[in-house]
Amino acid sequence: MKAQTAIDTRQFIQQYFDAWEESVAEKILSYYSDDVVIDVLGVPALLEGKPAVAENFVLPFTRAFPGNVHKILNFIHQGNQVVIEWMFTAVHKGEFSDMPATARTVNVPGCSVYTIEGDQITRGHIYFNGPTLLKQLGAAS
């Protein structure tokens, strides 16, 4: 594993979040190792491998919220681990969780914990406030 500085890792994470804003699934997925394991709060099973991450995480969010922005609020780096507190801002333009597009803007806080090996994410834990997202979409009170 190559040594990673906090500056290098922050640039890597910013580029990863920029790929989300571009909403090109293949570009987002290029930041993950082939055998990546992602645990997303609210998703009942671990997402193991790029196909599972694409189908159950990347594609649902990029289709529903194209052009989404992750603003980094806090960044902590230690070795090959990084913790990012972020604000997700997007307009609901496509179906999400069986809900048709509402054209509503959402602002949802979240946090990601990633393990980075070389230049790829190998493991991730993603926490965000699902009830806040659904409330902002008009699905929950």
Which residues does each PLM region occupy?
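C-terminal and inter-domain tail/linker signature
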Residues: M1-S141
